[in-house]
């Protein structure tokens, strides 16, 4: 689900400060800014070019006045054959990150409306990007997700889907990764789930007054939430570090309440939600001056089900949460005061994030081997970035994987793809491989040792420029039944292990002990 933000220059949501603040820990990327572009500042945040974090795509400048700088450029991906287009960003392995993608179409391609496409994070299909309604209203769109890094390289990808028009190209305006402290959302098992932001609100905050960095040290954006309930100003400041999620103190400055003895009803968010499990955190603070009498007790229910009982709210603030709470359709929060409590319930802020099951994991050794293979190719396919197997349907071109406890690479087929470079020795670490078909390319160097590929059934390396000898270990692979090596520059004798076997070997006259003398098998 998208969240709307009017990013016009006179309505910058992030406060402008007289003194600069250091950026949050992570990356703020201005997509499509170009290799020589200087950093740009939005509020007091500094965004740098995305060059060096992605190797594919074209750039475009939006011809519209008074845009915030990060919306004035974008990167788009016209290559229809690529299964995905990925950013690769160095991170702390196992670290927890808030990922935000921002989109502003700006009619960059001359089309009638923005394209619709998928976004993928760490191999999991995260959501569909559909900015049509927002753009029609003059708005940009952003999406957020909290996910942990599987390795030292983090991937965020875009991909076409069946709603992407034939003349449309996925695009992106800005990409942000903010490193989160361990305590934040720590009741979620991030080895199994991610948290996709649905809504994050500060109740009673004036329209347009969005809370972000530096009030929120992680640059989470707290949208204003107004309704018909009375607004009160809180007279004491909370300490963010007293809360596991470290909400900004400013999110508690205003609250909504009701009269003594009455229930407080809040319909939030304003749109219906799909049936799913959600992480819900609600934040409260008594708005009066600190004293022994500044407290209030009430029960909280969501859609008629008890959420928390006897919530005792003081001027120090309080949060109640549920890590996996079922929601469907319209959501209503009802706060019912306890007997004899002299003041009505109050609520300051809230977060709802959808619990998103992760789409599995490719064996890390396979990922490392495939990345090394890619680095040894001079011109790998444009979608050879991110997870080689995941999500299913968006694996690397020419790569087929098998599902198990981990996804494993079982076929590598780049026949006639025009690949140059060499075969990395790490191909031997792809121990689940059944088929290697790399014929009809421009590969140089030697055939690496493949003695560990016990599942290998066919090896096609014909019509390349490979040199050296044929590894004798090929004859000891128990399942190998087909070897095509013709039309290379190989030398030496055919290994004894490959003579008098039932393996179908295609060599022609290119295996020579001397340049002029072919070897008889």
Go through each PLM region and give its residues.
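Leucine-rich repeat
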Residues: 406-407, 428-433, 450-456, 475-480, ...
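The feature encodes a structural signal of leucine-rich repeats
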Residues: 423-425, 444-450, 467-472, 491-496
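Leucine-rich solenoid repeat scaffolds
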Residues: 471-521
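Generic structural signal for short, solvent-exposed loop/turn connectors between secondary structure elements
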Residues: 315-318, 331, 445-453, 500-512
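Tandem repeat domain/solenoid detector
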Residues: 432, 444, 455, 465-467, ...
């Amino acid at each position: 689900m998208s969240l709307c933000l009017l990013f016009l220059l006179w309505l910058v949501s992030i406060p402008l400060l007289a003194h600069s603040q250091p950026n949050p820990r992570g990356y703020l990327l201005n997509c499509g800014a170009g290799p020589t572009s200087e950093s740009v500042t939005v509020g007091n945040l500094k965004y740098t070019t995305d060059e060096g974090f992605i190797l594919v795509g074209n750039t475009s400048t939006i011809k519209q006045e008074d845009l915030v700088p990060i919306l004035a450029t974008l990167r788009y991906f016209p290559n229809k054959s690529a299964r995905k287009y990925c950013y690769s960003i160095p991170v702390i392995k196992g670290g927890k990150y808030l990922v935000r993608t921002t989109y502003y179409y700006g009619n960059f391609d001359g089309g009638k409306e923005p394209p619709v496409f998928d976004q993928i994070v760490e191999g999991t299909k995260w959501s569909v990007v559909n900015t049509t309604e927002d753009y029609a209203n003059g708005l940009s769109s952003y999406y957020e997700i909290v996910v942990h890094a599987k390795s030292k390289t983090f991937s965020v990808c875009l991909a076409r889907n069946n709603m992407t028009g034939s003349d449309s190209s996925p695009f992106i305006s800005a990409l942000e990764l903010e490193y989160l402290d361990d305590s934040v959302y720590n009741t979620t098992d991030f080895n199994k789930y991610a948290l996709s932001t649905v809504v994050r609100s500060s109740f009673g905050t004036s329209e347009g007054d969005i809370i972000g960095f530096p009030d929120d040290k992680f640059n989470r954006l707290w949208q204003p939430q107004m309704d018909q309930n009375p607004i009160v100003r809180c007279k004491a400041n909370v300490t963010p570090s007293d809360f596991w999620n470290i909400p900004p103190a400013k999110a508690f400055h205003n609250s909504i309440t009701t009269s003594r003895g009455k229930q407080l009803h809040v319909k939030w968010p304003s749109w219906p939600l799909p049936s799913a499990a959600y992480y819900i955190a609600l934040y409260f603070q008594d708005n009066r001056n600190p004293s022994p009498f500044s407290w209030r007790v009430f029960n909280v229910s969501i859609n008629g089900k008890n959420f928390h009982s006897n919530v005792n709210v003081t001027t120090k603030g309080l949060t109640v949460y549920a890590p996996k709470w079922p929601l469907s359709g319209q959501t209503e929060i009802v706060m019912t005061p306890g007997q004899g409590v002299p003041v009505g319930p109050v609520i300051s802020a809230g977060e709802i994030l959808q619990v998103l099951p992760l789409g599995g994991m490719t064996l890390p050794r396979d990922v490392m081997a495939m990345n090394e293979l890619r680095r040894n190719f001079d011109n790998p396919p444009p979608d050879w970035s991110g997870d080689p197997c995941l999500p299913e349907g968006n694996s690397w071109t020419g790569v087929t994987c098998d599902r198990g406890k981990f996804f494993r690479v079982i076929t590598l087929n780049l026949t006639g793809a025009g690949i140059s470079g060499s075969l990395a020795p790490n191909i031997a670490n792809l121990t689940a491989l059944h088929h290697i078909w790399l014929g009809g390319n421009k590969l140089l160097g030697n055939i690496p040792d493949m003695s560990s590929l016990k599942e290998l059934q066919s090896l096609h390396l014909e019509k390349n420029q490979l040199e050296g000898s044929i590894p004798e270990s090929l004859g000891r692979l128990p399942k190998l039944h087909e070897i095509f090596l013709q039309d290379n520059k190989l030398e030496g004798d055919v290994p004894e292990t490959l003579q008098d076997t039932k393996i179908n070997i295609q060599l022609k006259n290119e295996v020579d002990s001397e340049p002029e003398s072919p070897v008889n098998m």
